[in-house]
């Protein structure tokens, strides 16, 4: 089958809403994150979120100040985002909520994956007819905005090559991952030593299921339909919060 002939975009190229996506060769997938109602992913702390703001944080909650410094990775190079962040001269204050301990403070090695979170991820994989990997291995993604005390987000690939059944037909699912959520930002203030960002550690480490679909959406309407299908599928799992 011959490739379709693409014409030049019709309309004002300075106004994105005036252009038809198919004329631009637009095609995308979606990435959906779903928080799980379990304990934290790499510590045995409870998955609790506290209803506090920067003005209502209890005085007895400890605070720790840190600075993240860029370091060379295994390949010998410094990540470009980490290099940029180190030049911003920012410091970070972490408020230790009752459900955060040494692991959340990056003072203790992480524990194995929460078994209930893994079970839910495998259940969702089965709903998507995805193929589980033979071995769960935890990877580290560089996080340089201070929302993770370790400077990394821990992510595990659970399954691949799935399919989401929607009202308009099947949608390919490239990967399903299990990863930890970030800390919640409470405030950003300016000091004589640079910008200071304050985070609450209650959310840090909560399990997230990440679902990434294949790039099969030619327009925003299809994206919304695929998202709605993913949302309904996740809503059928009672352990998704």
Where are the regions that the model predicts?
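Basic, nucleic-acid-interacting segments
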Residues: 2-241
């Amino acid at each position: 089958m011959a490739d379709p002939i693409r014409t030049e975009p019709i309309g004002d190229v300075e106004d994105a809403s005036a252009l038809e996506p198919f004329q631009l060769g637009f095609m995308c997938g979606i990435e959906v994150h779903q928080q799980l109602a379990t304990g934290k992913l790499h510590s045995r702390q409870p998955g609790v979120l506290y209803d506090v703001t920067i003005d209502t944080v209890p005085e007895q909650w400890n605070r720790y100040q840190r600075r993240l410094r860029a370091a060379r990775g295994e390949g010998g190079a410094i990540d470009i985002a980490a290099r940029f962040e180190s030049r911003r001269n920012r410091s970070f204050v972490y408020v230790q909520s009752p459900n955060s301990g040494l692991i959340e403070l990056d003072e203790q090695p992480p524990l194995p994956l929460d078994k209930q979170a893994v079970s839910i991820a495998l259940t969702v994989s089965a709903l998507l007819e995805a193929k589980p990997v033979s071995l769960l291995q935890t990877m580290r993604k560089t996080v340089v905005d201070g929302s993770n005390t370790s400077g990394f987000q821990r992510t595990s690939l659970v399954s691949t090559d799935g399919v989401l059944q929607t009202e308009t037909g099947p949608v390919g699912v490239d990967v399903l991952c299990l990863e930890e959520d970030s800390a919640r930002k409470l405030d950003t203030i300016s000091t004589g030593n640079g910008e200071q960002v304050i985070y609450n550690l209650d959310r840090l480490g909560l399990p997230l299921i990440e679902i990434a679909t294949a790039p099969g959406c030619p327009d925003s309407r299809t994206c919304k339909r695929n998202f709605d299908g993913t949302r309904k599928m996740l809503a059928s799992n009672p352990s998704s919060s």
